[in-house]
């Protein structure tokens, strides 16, 4: 388990033992203001690596795992201001893991391409709304390509971006909602074979569902 200590700019690694209670193994420094940690295999060695977003330095720290509970020195990638939630997938069909990050200070989602060795290179930004936070990816319109959905915490709404398989996304439309979406997830919630969305509202402490139609459109349940 990895835990971000924002005030100390550290990541703490906890190792589980036979008691089932994780114990602190060690910690290491990261860029200022670590916020959200993702576990993803970026260099395709079948070992989970870490990606740490830092609000204070506007960076992503890519920390490759050795496979024995230790990690290599971080590779730091500069992104837009205030990186929040990320999504991962193969945006351009080259077999490597790519990333996208909601950058709140830029009112956009930033797309990065991976090279299969643990590096991420910024490719493009797409305008979302004010203070984007939540981000999720799946094939919303059933064309075989991954798409993006981004929730805006300040302006409300969910921006839908359809991918074309080359690493490029086109903004299709925005779902109108008054909810200040802080996180966003997807899944086939009604088992009809079509992806739906779930939005967490920060102010109302509620979970709102949107039903997908398989064409990239979503409607409140």
Where does each model-flagged region fall?
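Hydrophobic beta-strand segments that make up the repeating blades of beta-propeller
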Residues: 1-4, 50-53, 99-102, 148-152, ...
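Acidic Asp/Glu-based divalent-cation binding sites
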Residues: 9, 49, 58, 94, ...
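A short loop-to-beta-strand structural motif that recurs across blades of beta-propeller domains
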Residues: 10-13, 59-62, 108-111, 157-160, ...
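Beta-propeller blade termini
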Residues: 35-42, 84-91, 113, 133-142, ...
